[in-house]
């Protein structure tokens, strides 16, 4: 899924809000804390934004720096934003980018002094939905792929869901996120596939979920 977009970023008091993303990236924030002979845990951080943008500092970089203070290395995902993509690609791009990010982190774990079995994912709002999608739609590596990195597992070892969107089914779906991810009139197969409470399986990683009475 390529696109012909021009990169677009806005700014507010919280920092950068990426809108149109041409090339997905992971921004690496290594923890400088060291423990003798113990590799670090790592977390892939996924900002929210309703699948129309990415609140990159408030729910990304700032969180990565906080994780660093705990001795955890962090990666912030700048994924392609579904709202701006073609109808054929909008439901695919964010998950593809999250899966590739997890593969890259795990494949480079020795080089980055990371425990390959302690790589989690943390997401906010729509980023929480992508986090739960990655957790329920992962693989253990695509052995037949001609792309070497795709042979690495995309499964997170744990997930942290912060005021997440979870379901795409009314009446509990966040309809803005649903529309931006699946389009105006999605088919029922897509709605069910991305309703992650229905997709939990035996190898889904453990999760912790936060909501407040203001969410």
What kind of region is each of these model predictions?
Residues 56-76:
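Short amphipathic alpha-helix adjacent to the substrate-entry channel of hydrolases
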Residues 100-177, 191-192:
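Primarily recognizes the serine-hydrolase "nucleophile elbow" in alpha/beta-hydrolase
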Residues 39-48:
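Short beta-strand element of the alpha/beta-hydrolase
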Residues 1-28, 38, 89, 175-177:
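A domain-start/cap signature at the N-terminus of enzymes
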Residues 49, 73, 78-82, 165:
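Short beta-to-alpha linker loops that shape the active-site pocket of alpha/beta-hydrolase fold enzymes
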Residues 4-13, 164-199, 205:
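Mobile cap/lid helix-loop segments that gate and shape the active-site cleft of serine hydrolases
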Residues 203, 208-215:
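Short beta-strand/loop motif that positions the catalytic acidic residue
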Residues 55-56, 62, 79-116:
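Catalytic nucleophile-loop/oxyanion-hole region of alpha/beta-hydrolase
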């Amino acid at each position: 899924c390529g696109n012909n977009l021009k990169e677009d970023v806005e700014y507010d008091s919280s920092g950068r809000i990426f809108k149109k993303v041409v090339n997905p990236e992971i921004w690496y924030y290594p923890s400088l804390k060291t423990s003798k002979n113990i590799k670090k845990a790592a977390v892939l951080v996924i900002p929210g934004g309703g699948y129309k943008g990415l609140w990159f500092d408030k729910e990304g970089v700032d969180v990565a720096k906080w994780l660093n203070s705990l001795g955890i290395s962090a990666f912030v995902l700048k994924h392609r934003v579904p709202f701006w993509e073609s109808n054929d690609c909008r439901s695919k791009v964010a998950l593809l980018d999250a899966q590739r990010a997890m593969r890259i982190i795990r494949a480079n774990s020795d080089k980055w002094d990371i425990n390959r079995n302690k790589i989690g994912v943390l997401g906010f709002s729509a980023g929480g939905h992508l986090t739960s999608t990655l957790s329920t739609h992962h693989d253990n590596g695509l052995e037949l792929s001609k792309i070497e990195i795709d042979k690495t597992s995309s499964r997170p070892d744990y997930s942290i869901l912060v005021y997440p969107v979870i379901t795409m089914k009314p009446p509990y779906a966040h309809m803005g996120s649903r529309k931006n991810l699946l389009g105006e009139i999605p088919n029922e197969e897509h709605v069910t596939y991305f309703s992650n409470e229905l997709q939990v399986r035996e190898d889904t990683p453990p999760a912790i979920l936060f909501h407040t009475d203001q969410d």
